[in-house]
A protein has these predicted regions:
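Auxiliary Fe-S-binding modules of radical SAM enzymes
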Residues: 103, 111-205
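Short helix/strand-bridging catalytic loops that position acidic/His residues to coordinate divalent metals
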Residues: 47, 51, 82, 122-128
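Glycine- and other small-residue-rich loops at beta-strand/loop junctions that grip anionic moieties
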Residues: 9, 13, 107-109, 132
């Protein structure tokens, strides 16, 4: 196609076949090909709870099929899914770092109108540990310290339309304002991405 220089494809890790991977690998010799997969969590218990209908083992297998094929590989991760503790969330950084990814997009959990989670949140809000903006900034400071240093973080937060967002509100803070506060917190803590990363890192207990 004239003027097309590449493709960025975002999908689920269980929605791509070896046949498609091989085809895209051929295209990658001439075009830029980026594949981004919705990992969302590295815990099978969470993936089952939120009805993802795939396992983390399937996610890892998909990345294995895609590595060394000429692709730019990315991952999406949701921070704060129901039932996950701070230790679970920090362990995501350790597990994600083992994947052959180039980029990572982080999304803090948001409850939006007319979703299944909106119904669950209304009926059982105690099952949700939604971050305040201050707590999220503090958490991300710890998270990036455990993350492999060569992974490019392309996004720190999501931003649902205000007319659809139920929680958390964060007083209308914009993405760029949160990123600026994260930068400031990293400087204050004298920490940086990968400061505590080790190839043989064990899960946080």
């Amino acid at each position: 196609v004239p003027k097309v220089v590449g493709l960025v494809i975002g999908t689920r890790p269980d929605c791509i076949s070896e046949e498609i991977i091989d085809y895209l690998s051929v295209l990658s010799k001439k075009y830029f090909i980026s594949l981004e997969f919705g990992v969302e969590s590295t815990l099978n218990s969470t993936l089952k709870k939120v009805n993802r209908c795939h396992t983390y083992e399937e996610t890892k297998a998909t990345y294995e099929l895609c590595k060394n094929k000429g692709f730019h590989l990315g991952a999406h991760l949701i921070i704060g899914l129901p039932g996950e503790t701070k230790e679970d969330l920090l362990n995501h950084a350790i597990e994600i770092s083992k994947l052959p990814i180039d980029t990572l997009k982080l999304h803090h959990l948001q409850i939006v109108k007319q979703s299944i989670m909106a119904f669950q949140y209304k009926n059982n809000p105690e099952n949700f540990n939604l971050f305040t903006s201050e707590n999220y900034i503090d958490f991300i400071t710890d998270f990036v310290g455990l993350l492999r240093p060569d992974i490019i973080i392309e996004r720190f937060v999501s931003e649902a339309p205000q007319d659809l967002l139920i929680a958390p509100k964060w007083n209308g803070l914009k993405n760029f304002e949160i990123v600026a506060k994260i930068d400031q917190k990293l400087a204050e803590q004298n920490t940086w991405q990968g400061k505590f990363y080790r190839e043989d890192s064990q899960l946080v207990k």
